[in-house]
Amino acid sequence: MSVSMDHRVLALAGVAQALQQVRRIAETGHSEAATVRTAMDSVFRVDAASPEAVYGSAAAVAPGLRLLHNYFRNQGQDDVLPRLALAVLQLERRFVRDTATVATVASGIDAAARQAQQLGDSNHPDVLSSLGGLYAQTISHLRPKVMVQGNPHYLGQAGVVAEIRALLLAAVRSAVLWRQMGGSLWDFLFAKRAMIEAVDRALR
């Protein structure tokens, strides 16, 4: 059993389920509060000792693990989601190399964490607005740009846009964690079986 691969798939599941919520809210105007809260909490847990601690528990990323399970078995129902995930994983490389942007994002996350503590909810609309604004002012200017498509009616609403951007920030945070755990795009070519086995273990 590879502990590092087990950790990697949890982080990758964090990416997947944050982006699934992006897709959901862009199409329907609604997200799943518990899943969004897991994503937002992960943004604030920058000093957590393990991926499980980042998300609260492995069970908290079960939706993302199921997405990975289906993807690896060619049973995915959303063709756009893998493309979004690839864009986020590529964007993470640009982000971590831009030290000024990293510093700005870290400062903004600290401020949003204090706000969340005062409001008593990491999923509060004001917190989502702060994190969404932070993403818009920083990471969104890097390439590749993550393009979100959906229902124009919802994409024209400020609250929806803020939540989407906050979720994209959470997806990038999980991508950073994935790299920290040794993740690489080469894994999808040369370690796919190990990834599948790690996902299966996590879902048991």
From Swiss-Prot:
A Pfam family per the record: DUF489
Disulfide bond sites: none
Gene Ontology annotations for the cellular component aspect, listed alphabetically: cytoplasm; plasma membrane
Keyword entries, A-Z: Cell inner membrane, Cell membrane, Cytoplasm, Membrane
Coiled coil: none
Membrane topology: Peripheral membrane protein
Location of the protein in the cell: Cytoplasm; Cell inner membrane
Family: Belongs to the HflD family.
Record protein name field: High frequency lysogenization protein HflD homolog
Taxonomic lineage: Bacteria, Pseudomonadati, Pseudomonadota, Gammaproteobacteria, Lysobacterales
Name of the encoding gene: hflD
